[in-house]
Amino acid sequence: MPKMAAEKNSKPAKKAKLGQNFLSDASGALKIVEALGDISDATVVEIGPGRGAITDHLAKRAKRLIAVEIDRVLAAQLRLRYSRLENVEILEADILAVELSTVLAQRIGPLRDLRPTKPEKVRIIGNLPYYITSDILLRLFEAHALIDFAVIMVQKEVADRIAAKPGTRDYGLLSATSQLYTHVEKLFTLPPGSFNPAPQVHSTVLKLQMEPKLEALGVDEEGFDSFLKLIFGQKRKTLFNNLRVAYDMAKAREAMKAVGLKSDVRAEAVALEKTAQLYNELRKG
């Protein structure tokens, strides 16, 4: 996974260079937190707390809060701000490099006594940096077994792609992968004025309930993930031409015919269920 690079001696005012626009709408922040539901007995992981607009509400409500912030200055400020709260942990780290299972196993102070007897599923929340949204989502999908659901804010255009249906202009690899692992629900949209500095786009809050469809589709995780990347590899090409990169031409043609797909169809027009059928057909013999 690619990693974000923090600038040395970075200042909060320059955080936008890392793709961060700080949420400044108090009512919007509260609305996002309320989308998590009752978290009095839950562990919440916040991605990119920034100046703490969402964190303030989480700290008062969550049984345990782990806020992951890459910016050294912001992390230090947050650590000082919540130093007296035993349920809050500020982790200065790149979220793309964080192993969720390792973080959850670490208990500090009196929290050591709260270690569960079986793995807990956490709730994720965050205003995701625009330029690494896809990378963060893929990282979360990898850890789907540890996550209950995520409430995330992303660029509206990206939200449209995540929730897009097959056969529509926005449907692609991000749509298929998101819908393979989660049930996607659009909650609400915030205007540019809700942030500082104000971005040039609207932002949409999504709820991603982890509901992996791997077993129902009869596919293996690693293989099918790679298959999706293959068939969406070059959007201008037909599904058949993308398959030719990895499969014999005759085998690809026969498999498509066997599952009822025309040779000129494009991957974005094929439903996830049909894509899984094609994948399994190609695995035969």
Swiss-Prot record:
| Principal location | cytoplasm
Query: Where is it found, in Gene Ontology cellular component terms?
Result: cytosol
A Pfam cross-reference name: RrnaAD
> GO: which molecular function terms?
16S rRNA (adenine(1518)-N(6)/adenine(1519)-N(6))-dimethyltransferase activity; RNA binding
Identify the species of origin. Koribacter versatilis (strain Ellin345)
Function description: Specifically dimethylates two adjacent adenosines (A1518 and A1519) in the loop of a conserved hairpin near the 3'-end of 16S rRNA in the 30S particle. May play a critical role in biogenesis of 30S subunits.
Q: Could you tell me the keywords of this UniProt record?
A: Cytoplasm, Methyltransferase, RNA-binding, rRNA processing, S-adenosyl-L-methionine, Transferase
Per its record, the protein catalyses: adenosine(1518)/adenosine(1519) in 16S rRNA + 4 S-adenosyl-L-methionine = N(6)-dimethyladenosine(1518)/N(6)-dimethyladenosine(1519) in 16S rRNA + 4 S-adenosyl-L-homocysteine + 4 H(+)
EC number(s) for this protein? 2.1.1.182
Which residue spans traverse the membrane? none
| Enzyme class name | transferase
Matching NCBIfam families: ksgA
Binding of S-adenosyl-L-methionine: at which residues?
Answer: 21, 23, 48, 69, 94, 127
Q: Which SUPFAM superfamilies match?
A: S-adenosyl-L-methionine-dependent methyltransferases (SSF53335)
Q: Please report which protein family the annotation says this sequence is part of.
A: Belongs to the class I-like SAM-binding methyltransferase superfamily. rRNA adenine N(6)-methyltransferase family. RsmA subfamily.
Q: Kindly list the places in or outside the cell where this protein is found, as annotated in its UniProt entry.
A: Cytoplasm
- What protein does this entry describe? Ribosomal RNA small subunit methyltransferase A
